[in-house]
Amino acid sequence: MFDFVMSEEEIRIRDEVRSFVRNEVSSEYLQMLDRDEVDFPIEVYRKLAEKNLLGVRFPKEYGGRGSTWVAECAAVEEIGVLGSAIGCVYAMPSIVGEAIYMFGTEEQKKKYLVPMLKGKLVSAEALTEPRGGGGSDFFGTTTTARKEGEYYIL
């Protein structure tokens, strides 16, 4: 991302993430990921959380830094150097967190968003289900929910 469009704070966050990429994730670890010797890079996820680098655009009251989308995008760009596995893990609290932040109750934000940004809760999303020609038509996705006891089966 170009420095001339970024504020000092956004540059500082980008540089923090860049430093994390260079100093906290070894090439040996990345090779282990490539060889499928790591099921989920939880160690990296927790280190990012310890450094308050997850969901930097969310308000501080929920564990973010109260920064901007520009800072978030710059951080994602830097993390992307580590490959898609870690990039997806990094982006998930932001993607899932956005739905909780925008549409969740205060109770849900405290129950899910805060622990996500602290690295104590791992989030995920499902884009498609088997149907027709498959693919990843995010806006065309349909879902059914069936109640079984106290739970819903999606």
Where does each model-flagged region fall?
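Intrinsic disorder at enzyme termini
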Residues: 1-14
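An alpha-helix initiation/capping motif
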Residues: 11, 15, 35-42, 65, ...
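N-terminal glycine-rich anion-binding loops that anchor highly charged ligand groups
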Residues: 16-24, 43-51
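C-terminal helix-coil-helix/basic helical segment that borders enzyme active sites and/or dimer interfaces
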Residues: 26-36
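Short coil/turn segments at secondary-structure boundaries
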Residues: 33-34, 60, 126-129
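Internal helix-loop-helix
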Residues: 50-122
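Glycine-rich, Trp-frequent "lid" loop and neighboring beta-strands that shape
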Residues: 64-65, 107-154
